[in-house]
Amino acid sequence: MSLPKPEASCMLLDRTASAAHRLSMGSTNKLKIGIFGCNLNSGKNATLVPERWSGSWDDNLRLAQMSDDAGLEFFLPLGRWRGWGGATHYQESTFETITWAAALLAATKRITIFGTVHTPIFNPVVAAKTMVTADHAGHGRFGLNLVVGNKDEEFAMFGVSLLEHDERYVHGQEWLDIVRRCWTDPDNFDFDGKYFKLRDCLSKPKPWGGTQPLILNAGTSEVGQDFGVRNCDAFFTAVRASSFDEKTGMVVPDVASVKAIVDSLRARAAAAGREIGVYTNVNVICRPTQKEAIEYYRYVLEENADWAAVDAQLQQSGIPYADTPEYWAHRRRAIRQFPFIGSAEYVAELFATMSKAGFDGIGMTIVNYLDELPFLCSDVLPRLEKMGLRD
């Protein structure tokens, strides 16, 4: 009796795990495009609308396969252990990201899928093994998004106290050194550091293909950027420098300021003798016309905003609630994030602007990823191809 062959959608096709393939995510596209924040309920949009993102496993699986088939390069999850409350219990239901990545990697063909790992709450030897498991499931398509800090409230759940800012990177360096030794050292090893003292460590198998997963970091401080330059293949940096017209919903990136951010990161890496990729995220609301897009934006993020969840985020950032114009400006900036709102033509132009500023890739947050990604793939991606940004 012969067993049936696996479905094509779950077969791994024509991709190696060479270092070059890992760094390029197996793609020759000048501008890489991926999905950001789909592993939790509501994604990155604090909205009450009924069509908001469920974050369910079935929807994540469908989205991963849809993104893979469309040629998107990456899936990047948020590391979240508790949410922000509000009427929607915003971001309270979330999948742990390494196991999430492993399962999705086994069901996709080409896309790189990251796990977001908080170094203070993951034992590095255990983390090294679980990440290798995910990497084998995807034949070399796992990536590590490394985070050395987070909210005090989340760490308290694990009985862990947040270290002083710069000290987090000392701890993070030891953590990553141990992980890399687990990934590369053929022999047993000891480790005697400030935060970790380990004896006779051994970890097999090694990552798929004898190379190491792509490592991403989002440090913004001087010490954080130095850490990233030493250790990581790419930076993920948020963009705030832009003007936003409240009436038209049109965002105008401050290209000079954005380019300065990218150039600074690349210069820091070059001074250390390294090259790095630079990525960012945007919140996309794309419709056939600008009018439809701005109307949907107002419906989702103004008329139906989960303001209690937004307030919780602001307060955690040190901005207490106040019924003032200044506070409302903070609210609006927080909920819309860095928005790409408009027609397919306009959104494609915004992607091109970010590429010209030096970004290698962009992660998209979307109100409902499954409902809206097909239009982006059919109407925005072909425009980027004509611009020479994608094949």
Predicted regions and their residues:
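Active-site-adjacent structural elements that line small-molecule/cofactor binding pockets in enzymes
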Residues: 2-391
